[in-house]
C-alpha cells in the first residue's frame, strides 16, 4: 500500500482491479475542507486516460510491474511481434494496446515489455529515440531569423515540429514522453 501523498510521475498503482500509471498529479489544499490529490492516470491494459481525485492520505495498492528486455520485430496485421533477447520467445501485442508507443517503434529496436502477474500490459520506451526525417519542406535562407518551426514526417509516420535547418534524411532525437523534437543526432 502507498499513500496518494507519495504519488510520483511514472508510479504504477492498482485501483478498482485495473493497473494505472500516474502521468500527472497535484496536491490541492483548499482554504476550507480537506486536502486532496488530483491525478491523471493511464490504464496500462487499455491505454485509456482518466482524471481521478483522491482524498489526502488515502491508500492505494502499488502494482508490482516486471519488465523484460525485448526486441521489436515487425507488424503482423493488427498484431506487433516482440522477441525476448535471452530466450528468443516471441509475443504479440495488439496495436490498440500500444497505440502511443507505435509512433516511436522501429524494427529491431530494443524496448522493455511490462508484465503484471504474467500478463503483458504494455511497452516501456527509452526516454528518447532516433528517427529519420522522410518528408519536410526545404529550409529557405533567412527563415531562421524568426526562430520558427516546420512540420517533418518521420520514418514511423510521426509528424513533429522541427527547426527550419532540419532537412530530409536527417536523423533526429525525439522525446518519447511527448513526441517533441530534442536535437539532431
UniProtKB/Swiss-Prot annotation:
Involved in peptide bond synthesis. Stimulates efficient translation and peptide-bond synthesis on native or reconstituted 70S ribosomes in vitro. Probably functions indirectly by altering the affinity of the ribosome for aminoacyl-tRNA, thus increasing their reactivity as acceptors for peptidyl transferase. It is found in: Cytoplasm. One of its GO terms (biological process) is peptide biosynthetic process. GO terms for molecular function: translation elongation factor activity. Pfam families: EFP (PF01132), EFP_N (PF08207), Elong-fact-P_C (PF09285). The keyword Protein biosynthesis applies. This is Elongation factor P. The gene is efp. Keywords: Cytoplasm, Elongation factor, Protein biosynthesis. Pathway: Protein biosynthesis; polypeptide chain elongation. Belongs to the elongation factor P family. InterPro entries: Elong-fact-P_C (IPR015365), NA-bd_OB-fold (IPR012340), Rib_uL2_dom2 (IPR014722), Transl_elong_fac_P/YeiP (IPR020599), Transl_elong_KOW-like (IPR013185), Transl_elong_P/YeiP_cen (IPR001059), Transl_elong_P/YeiP_CS (IPR013852), Transl_elongation_fac_P (IPR011768). The lineage of its organism: Bacteria, Bacillati, Bacillota, Bacilli, Bacillales. GO terms for cellular component: cytoplasm.
